[in-house]
């Protein structure tokens, strides 16, 4: 998937990931019929993608969504598949169901969590560990870092689909998350729960200010 890891515990076990399948499908669809000589070509050197390959990817993608994979029940990476930049899902009901699950399970005041029980860059993460056992992932529940990046994905999608009320709401939310550096408004990679309020955030998710 987009996070370049295997299962949720990062044991290296391979999984099919909707974000990878969706990007591959979108890429093949974009390449189909491409003239390698560009606008000056005569059609003698065009890429022809077997439609069966695209159909297999479509079935695999629709079979996974709204999940990202077997171990990740929801993942913000799927926003890039159901909207900008891939727009890889034709089924509008599946698009809405996937978006609704991501917003419900992963949404927060500072953006979206990558996936549930994600310990990446939390204050309790052990950076010397390459993976965690499934029962150890509970220590990250409720304190997963939140990423403004995914609000930007949704903003671009909303603008391209001319959903202006939603675009304005997302723009307002993003503006509040920007930080000034050298006179520029920048967005941090993520917001995390400070060490001194980890227990309070675990008990009451969304109650503590992040940094």
Residue spans for each PLM region:
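Active-site-adjacent bridging/hinge elements
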Residues: 1-3, 124-131, 196-203
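Inward-facing hydrophobic residues that define packing positions of alpha-helical scaffold repeats
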Residues: 28, 99, 170-171, 178
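CBM-like carbohydrate-recognition segments
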Residues: 141-142, 176-211
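Extended ligand-binding clefts on enzyme/binding-domain cores
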Residues: 15-149, 160
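Active-site acid/base region of carbohydrate-active enzymes
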Residues: 1-19
């Amino acid at each position: 998937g987009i996070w370049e890891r295997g299962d949720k515990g990062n044991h290296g076990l391979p999984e099919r990931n909707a974000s990878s399948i969706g990007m591959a499908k979108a890429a093949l669809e974009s390449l189909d019929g491409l003239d390698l000589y560009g606008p000056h070509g005569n059609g003698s050197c065009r890429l022809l993608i077997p439609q069966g390959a695209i159909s297999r990817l479509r079935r695999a993608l629709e079979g996974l969504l709204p999940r990202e994979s077997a171990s990740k029940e929801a993942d913000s990476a799927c926003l890039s598949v159901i909207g900008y930049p891939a727009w890889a899902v034709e089924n509008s009901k599946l698009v809405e169901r996937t978006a609704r699950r991501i917003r419900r399970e992963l949404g927060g005041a500072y953006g979206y969590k990558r996936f549930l029980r994600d310990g990446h860059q939390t204050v309790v993460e052990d950076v010397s560990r390459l993976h965690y056992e499934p029962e150890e992932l509970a220590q990250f529940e409720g304190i997963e870092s939140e990423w403004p990046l995914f609000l930007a994905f949704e903003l671009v999608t909303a603008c391209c689909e001319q959903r202006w009320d939603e675009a304005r709401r997302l723009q307002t939310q993003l503006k509040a998350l920007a930080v000034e550096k050298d006179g520029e408004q920048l967005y941090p990679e993520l917001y995390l729960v400070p060490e001194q309020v980890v227990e309070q955030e675990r008990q009451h998710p969304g109650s503590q200010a992040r940094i």
